[in-house]
Amino acid sequence: PAKWAVLPIYCVYGERKRKNVFGTEQNLLSLSYGKVIRKDINTNGGLLPSNYNGYNIIEKNDIIIRPTDLQNDRTSLRTELVKEHGIITSAYIALKPKNRVSSKFYHYLLHSYDVKKVFYNMGNGVRQGLNYGEFAKLMVYYPPLDEQQEIADYLDNKCAEIEQIIADKKTQIETLDGYKKSLIYEYV
């Protein structure tokens, strides 16, 4: 569209680098299967840091990018919109909005890039990673704010409809599976 600009992402999002220096922030977040989830900061299982002072403090409406192991992992989702204040590993890129933008719109845009595997050609190094300096050059659309919000709202509604259809189908499958088991039990 004529009113849309194409800009490097650094024009609309900067990097959020605010360390949890004194360990005061305790809401531990992680990117898992394309969703930012809460984790128990007091857990004893798995690989854990000795403290969380090096973790980044992130805010609602930031966007998280997991830029590691681009050459190996071509199935997981690497982007998500942050929905709450917390801390996350500094291995991730945390994008903070610079201007009046719809973070939901940019989440959907970056998610579409993620699904199309755009990030895989951007990394470098032995483990093929990506840093903010490289990521900042990524070209993105910049429509007017009202259009960003309209697109994000439309996608929110359509995605909610699809999620409801999926939930309904899962319920139908569970019902049919129960019927199948009952039928087998009755006739055997």
Predicted segments with their positions:
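Short amphipathic coiled-coil heptad-repeat segments
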Residues: 1-3, 160-188
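A structural connector/turn signal
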Residues: 47, 52-53, 83, 125, ...
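A short beta-sheet element
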Residues: 56, 60-115, 131
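Short, flexible domain-boundary/linker segments around small modular repeats
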Residues: 144-146, 153-158, 162-167
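Non-catalytic DNA-recognition/assembly elements of restriction-modification systems
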Residues: 1-20, 137, 145-149, 182-183
